[in-house]
Amino acid sequence: MPHPTDANCRSCHSDAGAMQASLQLGRKLPAAAFDFRPEQGRVLFKAPRPERGYTKIIHRFATDHPEFQVLAEKLKDPDTLHFNHALHLTSPNIAPLKSRKLDCADCHKPDAAGVYHLKISYNDHCQNCHSLQFDVHNPDLPVPHGNAGHVRDFLRSLPEQYADYGAKKGIQGRRELETFVQEQMKQIREQAGSGGELERRVFFSDARTGPVARIGLTGGLGAARFPGCAYCHEVAPSGGEVPQVSSPVLTDRWLIRGRFDHGKHFKVACVFCHAAERSRESSDVLLPSKQICVRCHSPQGGVADDCSTCHSYHAPRKETVAAR
């Protein structure tokens, strides 16, 4: 199928009669008919379909193309992970990483093709500063990460954990190892109370209020204390069962009916398009507005602004979908 031109697009999208007919037909179709084709392995942001569908009259991007829906409707990032971009990028209280302040590229790294970004993970991007060192006296014995059940099992088997830890540290002899375990259990109870209290603190403390804020404290630049799961995650009790700890939902693609290639924009500073330095809420969607795009993608800006710059035809061949 030949590549569609702007004239092809305008033959429908600039025709009020065609758009009205599309609106009426769309109201007769099931909602599932408009579901966007999923991209395997990618997390897509699915905005609610507008009441009139996508039938606004459009002549060209710079003039009457609507604002991006996620911004026009002030939609929120569904991720429940607590994260403050402004704090990480601008706060003087954030320890330097390799003798310099954090910047976008410390966490957001392009994939091999340069189009998308690699997944962000705790192990690769968080643990250097946000440790899981719950015991100040044994910083090499962290709480496990990624599974609430494993965390509870770890805390309820602390004597065995300390025994294994002591053996790895070279403590030999049954009596010496038993003494080590007893000493560690005594000091951790002095730090955080009984086993049940320690478990409550590990899961539900968010390091913001009261005595539960201090579970453990480690020294060293960039080695932060472990404040509790609730510092970063939504945590809910579960009737005596393992607490429910929310998993991050990190969106790969926001404007799923368009396309964007970061590699073609590598000369543009991140902050030109993304207001990360002013974002303090995890729910903020840090997409550029249409007006920011128009600065370049318009006749005045001199960069391509035809429809196919960002959009494919509605029903591409299967191999085209797979390649995007």
What spans do the regions from the language model cover?
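Short sequence/structural segments immediately N-terminal
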Residues: 1-324
